Amino acid sequence: MTSMDTLRTALFALRGNWMRSALTSLGVIIGIAAVIVMVSVGQGTQAEIDKMVSGLGSQRLDISPGAGRGGGGARMSSSSFFTLNEGDVEAIRTDIPEVQYVAGALRGNTQVVYAENNASTSWQGVQPDFFDINGWTIVNGEGFQAQDYTSADKSVIIGETVRRTLFGDETGIGQTIRLGRVPFTVVGTLNSKGQGGFGQDQDDVVMVPLQTARRRLMGAMGLPAGAVMQIALTVADAKDLSYAQGEVEALLRQRHKIAPGDEDDFNVRNISEIVATRTATTNLMSKLLGAVATICLIIGGIGIMNIMLVSV
């Protein structure tokens, strides 16, 4: 029997048993599709984690005010909201040599307006190292100058989403916009970072110098002198991160005069630990998805076997 004879015999058998052939093919297709989908979901989730790591940095610590160590977040009250200050930032900079960059920040939300265009966005009042810590670069215009950080100058650097909303295809450099009721001059625009690992639009933001935010944007909030809402830092070498975290915690407890056994009035968040936890969760989910895909293949195989047996 030639190859053509074999092919004709096979086609004749398929036509004669089209239902069995269709169901057999469907079982194979469902099993393979399940495997492909499950693998794709696992790889997509891992890609999101990698994106989060690149956006947040694996050599970074974030310090926020509030009582309590670790656990499920800060237990905030009006008296514990401003427990960090610029003195803490400078102490970390000078006393912990493993720290590469450190910056304090204030933050809030505001309405940003230019001509007939307006949008609700978030603002951050920052110190010089903040840009290096967060991977921000200036793509148009220039960054803040040294005097801007000390004189409460009304200069602003805008994110890509804000630039596009207010100015369309223009850069907006040199234009005056309003944050709330306060006029600011646009001196620069930031590189686009897209959606963050937690789903937020990282480009929907404007930056002003820390002292500018304190005097111009915080309003009647009644900040303690030199207070900041956040301190972020990076270390030069990732292997020093855990050691630096311990040093930072000890330094802040000393500066804040926290007695042994008392709770911290701050929280230190280790980004690498968060990423490790999320990665472990993703790996577990990938294993579960793989098990589901395997079950789908087995069920498909059993279905094929049953159809073949019935047709005999």
Model-derived segments and their meaning:
Residues G42-S122, D129-D132, Q147, R164-T165, ...:
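Hydrophobic, regular-secondary-structure patches
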Residues M1-I32:
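N-terminal Sec/SRP start-transfer signal
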Residues A232, D240-L241, V248, A259-A293:
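Peri-transmembrane interface segments
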Residues T6, A10, T24, E48-I49, ...:
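Hydrophobic alpha-helical segments typical of transmembrane helices
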Residues A13, G27, A34-G42, S286-V312:
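A hydrophobic alpha-helix feature that marks transmembrane segments and, especially
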Residues Q124, P128-F144, D148, D153-A259:
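Mid-to-C-terminal secondary-structure elements
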Residues I29, M38, Q230-T234, N267:
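Short aromatic/hydrophobic contact patches that present stacked aromatics
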